[in-house]
Amino acid sequence: MHNKSVAELSRELESGRISSVELTQQFLDRLKTEDGKYNSFITISDEQALAEARAADEMRAAGKATVWTGVPFAHKDIFCTSGIRTSCGSKMLDNFVPPYDATVTANFKAAGAVCLGKTNMDEFAMGSSNESSFYGAVTNPWGLSGGDKRVPGGSSGGSAAAVAARLVPAATGTDTGGSIRQPAALCGITGLKPTYGRVSRYGMIAFASSLDQGGPMARTAEDAALMLNVMAGHDPKDSTCIDREVPDYTATLNEPLKGLKIGLPKEYFSDQLAPAMEEQVRNAIREYEKLGATVKEVSLPNAKLAIAAYYVIAPAEASANLSRFDGVRYGYRCEDPKDLMDMYTRSRAEGFGNEVKRRILVGSYALSAGYFDAYYLKAQKVRRLIQQDFINAFKEVDVLMSPVSPTPAFRQGEKNTDPVSMYLEDVFTIAINLAGIPAMSVPAGFVDGLPVGLQIIGDYFSEARLLNAAHQFQQVTDWHQREPQ
């Protein structure tokens, strides 16, 4: 059963060939025997999962089942789950058990899905390799046969590794600068970052509030569409959540692609892209031409400024968001503080990891009195230029296509001493978050036995078009079906 997609598992449950309790137990057993190799989970919630599975079987017996009823999945450990620890990969929240559910969590519960647990992640979603987690690094299921341990990408590396290793059929992720798409690409799965405001952020622990967006991670575009059907929608608890009708994202998956206009941003096919990666991406684009699409080169002239702008805006917002973790109300508190200031200082110094502290420092500096205009305000002006570049491009084409990552998965520890080198891993994904548009990663080949992702970028609220393009590609290729050895 572990090799079946969400859609296939739903049909198995519908037919009565297996119950949700049996299916859930199979996945829990596999998780406990296999995850030692990957460290993709922080918390496995056996009792709650089996209770949800029993409720799902009752729901089905009463004729109230949805597509998701009884289907196992996992949440990235950034979504609050009532009664289940939500750590955000940090010592700071190692003992935090939320008293409420995030909206995304509540939506899956209402659909009858079964949450097996919480997946590992970079601490507070800050990272591109899933090596900054308080619970240890996650290992990419690909490349293990050669004796190498590769990173799965970050920050949603646990979700990506768990789906790639067939430990769960699907998992939620979040994307602030590439944190769904980059791990999806490096682990050979499908991942979608929706339009900013399409998915509620209520109960999703904040990193950078104007950039964060939750989204689906699964093996197929069809499964991603099924997930987005549950995740998307207006939520009055999140003031940035858009009040706009949610289509059935599975309804247009089979539309033909004849006449689709594809733009290739010349800035994303630059010297930063490894030649072998470019070859795989261009091969994938040729498949689209066979499906009836046309291709032209376009320009995003301000793309080169994206990383500089992002690493002012995101840390600035993070420094404000993370100021709430002070040892007073919840989270880690240092032992025997001398006074209030000592408690604040030591709780944060001991509770946060190095990468989080680095970004808080950068963000606080960018927001400080003498530098606000020079850094933060200027970065926001650059952000507007980047957004306008995409608006202009979509006047000419329907979608943009590019690589997701400049290289395949690198070895664990390879970039830990060079933060800038690590930040450059997101060079092709960050601008999309700054603009707030949707984009997804689709498996598109291999380099040296490691997966390559094709990035499909769309205009605002064009998730259905992206999923359609990805699904049609997956009908004529089998990259998404390959399994790590």
UniProtKB/Swiss-Prot annotation:
GO terms for biological process: translation. Allows the formation of correctly charged Gln-tRNA(Gln) through the transamidation of misacylated Glu-tRNA(Gln) in organisms which lack glutaminyl-tRNA synthetase. The reaction takes place in the presence of glutamine and ATP through an activated gamma-phospho-Glu-tRNA(Gln). The keyword rRNA-binding does not apply. It comes from Marinobacter nauticus (strain ATCC 700491 / DSM 11845 / VT8). Belongs to the amidase family. GatA subfamily. It catalyses: L-glutamyl-tRNA(Gln) + L-glutamine + ATP + H2O = L-glutaminyl-tRNA(Gln) + L-glutamate + ADP + phosphate + H(+). The active site is at K76, S155, S179. It comes from the Bacteria. The lineage of its organism: Bacteria, Pseudomonadati, Pseudomonadota, Gammaproteobacteria, Pseudomonadales. Keywords: ATP-binding, Ligase, Nucleotide-binding, Protein biosynthesis. Heterotrimer of A, B and C subunits. Gene3D superfamilies: Amidase signature (AS) domain. Its EC number is 6.3.5.7. Disulfide bonds: none annotated. GO terms for molecular function: ATP binding; glutaminyl-tRNA synthase (glutamine-hydrolyzing) activity. One of its GO terms (cellular component) is glutamyl-tRNA(Gln) amidotransferase complex. This is Glutamyl-tRNA(Gln) amidotransferase subunit A.
